[in-house]
UniProtKB/Swiss-Prot annotation:
The lineage of its organism: Eukaryota, Metazoa, Spiralia, Lophotrochozoa, Mollusca. This is Conotoxin as25a. It comes from Conus cancellatus. Its main location: secreted. GO terms for molecular function: toxin activity. The modification 4-hydroxyproline is found at residues 4, 23.
Length: 23
C-alpha cells in the first residue's frame, strides 16, 4: 500500500488498498 496514514475514509486510488487491507 502507498497510502502513508492508511486513512480508511480516503478512497483515492492510492489509498483503496488500505481499505481492502492490501499492500
Amino acid at each position: 500500500c502507498k497510502c502513508p496514514s492508511c486513512n480508511f475514509n480516503d478512497v483515492t486510488e492510492n489509498c483503496k488498498c488500505c481499505i481492502f487491507r492490501q499492500p
